[in-house]
């Protein structure tokens, strides 16, 4: 298939990159053969208060699970992001902020950010926050979100950031689980020209009968919009920092002390509080940021993720700031007020490195490349993709239209649980194939196993596992260690199970095929839904596609495709048949969709992930009990899909 095309590393990039292919091979080999020695050296990239002497105490044995890194050292994450840059770079810009409205812009130097963080850390202390307390942060994409995180880290409090698009119920469940005393929010946020009622959502969440721990709500004035006020509980951010000292000594934290909680929704049941600790996480986030993006001092780096996701934590706050980078933070969405916004911002801020998601790339692709006619893009050097496998068609569009065919693309695979990037190309070292995450980062040992846990060699397909620990790995599910062991280490003994399927090609490159529950078994043959989706999207009239299995009398499972057409394309039975033939030609008869439903929109979370469990239920005609839809960007999409579903029981 065309996805096998190879994009070679240019000589110019290889010559100037931090790591070329020979260096990658040498360093990778050392990291696997001698992890103690490798990480002893690379752990020094951050500042330690008490240097570590013990590097690694890890085992994936589910009866005796242990994940410890640099575990006798002490440090502070906030000091690593701020204080250590002050002597040489206090005037360097740390954050460039652009509001939802492009007329609103701010620049904050490392010196200024340090002052703001110290003042807010003292403000938190004045409200009774102590080391080990969990602080819930529900903020828009403004610099103060990073200030709040770093202030917590400075005084040893554990932050739990909740994405600003989540509903009151979602907020409540996270506050209850973490027993937060303090919630930090904003009157409103701005996104795509609309005001988002953050404070109102917090008020509603805190009315939940099981929320009993919250004592104070700190409110940032962002829009000046009208809000309700609870005397004695609510306090303005600005009134607290006005009187706070700008000197705040850092709390000395053990490497294995918690840095943050980040909740991920399990496919069922309560959200999982993924717990990351301080030392290993800071080493891994900063190292992956530098090497994966080939970051050079002074470059402008833009990660479009929201601070409420792990990508925002690792690659907008902790990784880049630990490296002294200049980070662009954007409050709104990069395709508002028009699809040209992304290109305008790259040009306006002379962005050198862009890290974004396939869902945005596909959305821009559907609008057409004419929106980039005025885009210059000459500042751009490296481009990344994160969040889900990127289909080859979108990869090539990204490469041609945004990267003008001269920027390497790093298609990164990792998870909330992994803390940082695990499988990725390196710009100066890895020839890329559209759709492949390519090779493991240093210290990462992926393997493919069959359903019995037997390791598969060579070019093959199977369940993606990791054989040994890496410093950025999560340590537990907050308050439920048994769930942690059960979810990740019981399925395949002695291995971390990612929940993803993958194939490895003859070059040793990894291709993520999607969640293992996104595999369709058609007449005894396993088909990754991502593969069928890629084939559909490679048709010029298809903007987006989501594929699920549904019960089929003859095949066991049939293939059900939800297809969004490009703007202006008419739905027709002829086009439906054309798409079925197209997939047949691209993959084979086995992959031909049985049912194709036209979909004006797909059920997505606000980070752009397609919620396939809804699609599976609709395809199976199980439409009475779909479960919680509160995390969807547009819950109305579900109603439309139910009304137009094809698999009704007549």
Curated annotation (Swiss-Prot):
Entry EC no(s): 6.2.1.1
GO-annotated molecular function: acetate-CoA ligase activity; AMP binding; ATP binding; metal ion binding
Post-translational modification summary for this protein: Acetylated. Deacetylation by the SIR2-homolog deacetylase activates the enzyme.
GO biological process: one example: acetyl-CoA biosynthetic process
Binding-site residues for Mg(2+), renumbered to this chain: 537, 539, 542
Residues reported to bind ATP: 387-389, 411-416, 500, 515, 526
Annotated Gene3D superfamilies: 3.30.300.30, N-terminal domain of ligase-like (3.40.50.12780)
Entry keywords, A to Z: Acetylation, ATP-binding, Ligase, Magnesium, Metal-binding, Nucleotide-binding
One Pfam entry name: AMP-binding_C
PTM annotation (N6-acetyllysine): residues: 609
InterPro entries per the UniProt record, alphabetical: Ac_CoA_lig (IPR011904), ACAS_N (IPR032387), AMP-bd_C (IPR025110), AMP-bd_C_sf (IPR045851), AMP-binding_CS (IPR020845), AMP-dep_synth/lig_dom (IPR000873), ANL_N_sf (IPR042099)
Annotated residues for binding of CoA: 191-194, 311, 335, 523, 584
Listed cofactors: Mg(2+)
GO CC, any one term: cytosol
Catalytic reaction annotation: acetate + ATP + CoA = acetyl-CoA + AMP + diphosphate
Family: Belongs to the ATP-dependent AMP-binding enzyme family.
Function summary: Catalyzes the conversion of acetate into acetyl-CoA (AcCoA), an essential intermediate at the junction of anabolic and catabolic pathways. AcsA undergoes a two-step reaction. In the first half reaction, AcsA combines acetate with ATP to form acetyl-adenylate (AcAMP) intermediate. In the second half reaction, it can then transfer the acetyl group from AcAMP to the sulfhydryl group of CoA, forming the product AcCoA.
HAMAP family assigned: Ac_CoA_synth
PANTHER family the record matches: ACETYL-COENZYME A SYNTHETASE
Protein name as annotated: Acetyl-coenzyme A synthetase
Lineage, uppermost ranks: Bacteria, Pseudomonadati, Pseudomonadota, Gammaproteobacteria, Alteromonadales
